[in-house]
A protein has these predicted regions:
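Flavin (primarily FAD) cofactor-binding/catalytic cores of flavoenzymes
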Residues: 1-54, 116-664
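Redox-cofactor-proximal catalytic regions of oxidoreductases
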Residues: 42-111, 618
């Protein structure tokens, strides 16, 4: 009889759950005997970020129709077990509402109300998504094939090593001292705590010296929001998604209410409870992420993707021996699509924005975009737009992400008025959906991210381009535009600002400790007003996803043993390599399929194995998820329901490749 293979999966959140699901499905087909040890101090399925006991005010950043941990039939070669087949979050949600699916434990009334209020386009509470993940895990566990067994260890993995002479090649140690033997180890670690940056350490030290309160970056569900005082100034650094979570807890979470504005259907009115702190927020761009447009699906149905396609990138690969560059090869194609979709919608909805007939303009624009004349196309578009489009209606992509860059304000009140006007316009655009040119340009960027993830994973770009162009420049730009919250959050922020609950510092603020006055001080160089002083400062951001800064006994000990290392990237000739944020792994980012004569996009998913200190590939230690940020981009984005494996479901395809590799040993 073939011996049983033992697999330790470290991390029981979505990526670890995918590993379990794929191992189970593959083992059911091959009849291989497998024992899975699932290790995580948090509950299996939901894990840390999606745990089911968190506030229902914390929302996902994707609508109900988007996320899944189960690939559609036919996507991965071997379908999931029958009990979970095709079970995306949206299908699970509908099943719970109509009574055909029973949650693992009974929903309380608040959960039931939240679930029944959702539509496929609404953004669900994270705790409700955790309920889905919990159900998937429990259903898998209850219907394991006879050749598969599973043990859950509610503990932290703290070490792993190679056992040269033992029956099983590896051992994984848990907090408390238990050691688990393994033939293979899957690192699906998810979000980890991280060491603070030097400036943050200075704030910690200053707070300790003067009795101030400083909250470092954390997962929002872990923060003790009730500790923040009523009616005192609280500085908040960061205006991304965690900022929305902070606002929800400090307003609705304290009894405040939002109601429709009877005089303006696009606005809300906030009724304070009196228990709110005085929130003063700041970030580099000075504004929150732009709201997502209201669409009938995740992508705009009328969006035209003409230039940045897998076929176009394939042509680049087939006609050049050079490694791709983001700035030279990919970004121009992405910009072309954004320009085309912006002006196409502008011509349809606002023909008076053109000095010449809108149809004539589009024909000229089309000709320029189709002409492969290198970098000159951009200057030609700029000249055409300058001559043909009314000022104020021209697309300025960089200004979209930083609307107040290099703009001076005389007071906080003046800046707040400008921000509220900006928020109202953003809400108006989101509610127009596919009739808004700006939102369609942003939707084009959002669609490009899916194609870009495939290109980067399968073809790759140069190290210098990865570090300096993709991660440093493009990533913050596109996140501020395409990774924004639901429009409800921007409506709420505008209402809170009108109610005087929230104020803004301005772009590029500095946060320091004034040791003479014994308080935090924050000010923006672009707003000429008295600096804001406070005894409370919170970082509205999650810990950095960076293996060199992450606090993980497991990774630290594996690094000391030489089993893992961070990936180094060569950014320019003769310069010292820089450390990237992810682990070094063995799967090449440039896949060569010799049967087809070269790299063929859309055909590759990978079983990523760790690379150790001496360039040695460890054959039985695999990586899934966030720690792959050196070879994949957008690693925190969930798998997309009903998407092809090489596009929106790549995380599931990678888990499938890992399962195949493990069972083939």
């Amino acid at each position: 009889m073939v011996s049983q293979r033992r697999v330790v999966v470290v991390g029981a959140g979505p990526r670890g759950l995918s590993a379990v699901e794929r191992l189970t499905a593959r083992a059911a087909q091959t009849r291989a005997r497998v024992h899975i040890d699932l290790v995580d101090p948090f509950p299996p399925g939901a894990g840390h970020v999606w745990r089911t006991d968190q506030s229902l005010l914390f929302l996902m950043n994707t609508p109900s129709l988007f996320p899944t941990v189960i690939a559609p039939d036919g996507a991965l070669g071997v379908d999931p077990l029958a009990e979970v087949r095709n079970m995306s979050f949206e299908r699970w949600r509908r099943g719970v509402v109509d009574g055909s699916i029973t949650p693992v434990s009974a929903l309380d009334q608040a959960e039931r109300d939240a679930l029944e209020a959702l539509t496929s386009q609404d953004f669900p509470p994270r705790a409700i998504y955790g309920r889905y993940l919990e159900w998937i895990y429990t259903t898998l566990n209850n219907h394991l094939p006879s050749n598969v067994t599973l043990t859950v260890h509610r503990a932290e993995a703290v070490d792993a090593w190679v056992q040269e002479e033992a029956r099983h090649r590896y051992a994984v140690e848990l907090a408390g001292g238990q050691s688990i033997p393994a033939d293979a180890v899957v690192l699906a670690l998810g979000h980890l705590d991280a060491h603070l940056r030097p400036g943050q350490k200075e704030l910690v030290d200053g707070a300790a010296e003067h009795g101030l309160t400083y909250w470092p970056p954390t997962v929002p569900a872990d923060a003790p929001w009730a500790d923040l005082p009523e009616q005192e100034t609280v500085l908040v650094r960061g205006m991304g998604l965690n900022f929305c979570d902070a606002l929800a807890q400090l307003t609705e979470g304290r009894g405040g209410t939002f109601e429709p504005d009877k005089n303006n259907p696009e606005r809300l009115i906030y009724r304070p409870s009196g228990k709110e702190p005085h929130i003063v927020a700041g970030s580099r761009r000075g504004t929150p992420y732009r709201a997502k447009p209201q669409l009938k699906g995740y992508y705009a149905h009328t969006l035209e993707t003409r230039f940045f396609t897998l076929e176009a990138v394939q042509n680049l690969l087939d006609t050049s021996s050079e490694q791709l560059s983001f700035e030279r090869d990919l970004w121009p194609l992405i910009r072309k699509d954004a320009n085309w979709n912006y002006y196409r919608v502008l011509a349809r909805t606002s023909p008076d924005a053109f000095i010449e007939p809108a149809g004539d303009f589009l024909r000229k624009l089309d000709a320029i975009l189709l002409d492969n004349d290198g970098a000159r196309w951009s200057q030609r578009v700029e000249a055409l737009v300058s001559a043909s489009v009314v000022p104020g209606r021209q697309l300025q992509q960089e200004r979209l992400a930083r609307p107040f860059e290099d703009v001076n304000f005389d007071s906080h009140d003046e800046y707040a008025a400008a921000v509220v006007h900006y928020l109202d316009r953003d809400v108006h655009g989101s509610l127009r959906g596919e009739d808004d040119p700006v939102k369609m340009a942003i939707s084009s960027l959002n669609a490009a991210r899916t194609v870009l993830k495939c290109v980067l994973a399968e073809a790759g770009i140069s190290d210098s381009s990865w570090v300096n162009e993709l991660r440093r420049d493009f990533e913050p730009f596109v996140e501020g535009l395409a990774s924004g919250p639901p429009v409800l959050r921007i409506q709420q922020l505008a209402a809170l600002t009108r109610a005087g609950v929230v104020r803004f510092l301005g772009p590029e603020p500095r946060f320091v400790v004034d040791r003479n006055e014994g308080c935090f001080v924050a000010a923006s160089p672009w707003v000429s007003d008295t600096p804001v002083r406070a005894r409370w400062l919170i970082e509205a951001m999650s810990p950095a996803n960076d293996v060199h800064r992450n606090i993980s006994p497991l990774l630290s000990n594996m690094h000391e043993r030489g089993l893992v290392r961070g990936k180094l990237m060569e950014t320019r000739d003769g310069a010292s390599p820089v450390t990237s944020t992810g682990l070094d792994v063995s799967a090449s980012a440039r896949r060569v399929d010799t049967a087809l004569g070269g790299l063929k996009l859309g055909t590759g998913a990978f079983a990523y194995r760790v690379v150790g200190q001496k360039d040695a590939v460890e054959p039985g230690i695999f990586v899934l998820g966030l720690q792959l940020s050196s070879v994949q981009w957008g690693v925190s984005i969930a798998a997309e329901a009903d998407s092809p494996a090489h596009l929106g479901a790549r995380t599931l395809a990678d888990a499938d490749q890992v399962a195949q590799a493990i069972l083939a040993e």
